[in-house]
Amino acid sequence: GNTVVLKHATQTLQVGERLAEAFHAAGIPDDVFQNVFLDHDTTSALIAERQFGFVNFTGSVGGGKAMEVAAAGTFTPVATELGGKDPGYVRADADVDAAVDGLMDGAMFNAGQCCCGIERIYVHESLYDAFVEKAVTWVNALKLGNPLETDTDIGPMANVRFAAEVRAQISE
């Protein structure tokens, strides 16, 4: 069978731990799903030494390039999902409530810090005012707080660089 070695982003240590807990609680043996805490250089070194039969990387373009370079010497197959930050589209025939719920959740999930997050939304002009009004109401209802508390909707940014990027986007 296949095994999984999860090396998560250094800013998201709890995510890997929670996934490991869930898989192990479901009966997956420890040696089949492993959560590892590695820096970028160590990760690249392990891939370069062909420690894995396949690498699936989700993250930045720079990180993806590093994984491809590390794997190139051993011809280890690599699949990458890079950059992220997808657009959302609201057509004239859309259900505005459903569009707001789906797109705002997609934008705000994980405080907007996921590579599949909705970064920009294009709304048909006939629905624009209603969409914006409902989106503002949706955002205002979010509870900011400690991410370890179950009633928190949005916690802090993972690092200073992410916070600066969001501030810049807001100021635009």
Where are these regions (language model features)?
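Rossmann-like NAD(P) dinucleotide-binding subdomain of oxidoreductase/dehydrogenase enzymes
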Residues: 2-98
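ALDH superfamily catalytic-core signature
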Residues: 54, 62-172
